[in-house]
Regions:
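Nucleotide 5′-phosphate-binding alpha/beta core
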Residues: 1-102, 108-184
Length: 184
């Protein structure tokens, strides 16, 4: 096991250096917004809120804020989400949304369904790896990297509905964990 600890420690060091060079600032957020609008412009939501036109503007953020209204969950659910949940394709996101995370929330509806797209799952996976790479900064001993880890999350029980699967976000993410996590 010591060799595994050494290998993982070295990997976190390399990942940390790469991520530190990238930096996370406004430019990256703007790129993410542009990419999201670009990806969703051919959806019904993108058509109604003129995503094609937003992308032609110099100030995408201001134009997006001007074109897309702020609404509460109940209004968004009624106008957009219920059709996606019913299986509508290209409605709020490209393709059909297969997963919905359940949230009790604090306002409005007693139970909320939050769309979880394939892109979102991949993003969670990338962020998890980046967080892991930050361990390098803690200068932990090699033994740490081969020790057992306790991960705490919500229920991994997912419920299959006619058009989608729903459950706790942690359960959806666990289903898409790229490598098995052995139980000690």
């Amino acid at each position: 096991m010591p060799i595994i600890g050494k290998l993982i420690r070295k990997t976190t060091a390399l990942s940390f250096k790469r991520n530190a060079k990238k930096g996370i600032d406004y430019r990256h957020q703007l790129e993410a917004l542009r990419a999201t609008i670009e990806r969703a412009k051919s959806t019904k939501f993108g058509f109604v809120y003129s995503f094609h036109a937003i992308l032609t503007k110099t100030d995408v953020v201001s134009q997006y804020q001007k074109m897309v209204p702020i609404v509460d969950y109940d209004e968004f659910h009624e106008k957009w989400l219920k059709d996606s949940i019913a299986g509508a394709k290209d409605h709020t996101w490209k393709g059909r949304i297969k997963y919905y995370a359940l949230s009790s929330g604090t306002t409005g509806s007693p139970s909320k369904r939050i769309p979880v797209t394939t892109e979102m799952i991949r993003s969670f996976q990338r962020v998890s790896l980046r967080q892991f790479s930050i361990l390098h900064e803690l200068n932990l001993p090699e033994e740490f990297y081969s020790a057992s880890i306790l991960a705490v999350g919500g229920s991994t029980k997912l419920t299959k509905k006619s058009t989608h699967v729903e459950g706790d976000l942690s359960g959806i993410l666990k289903k898409h964990t790229p490598c098995p996590t052995p139980m000690a």
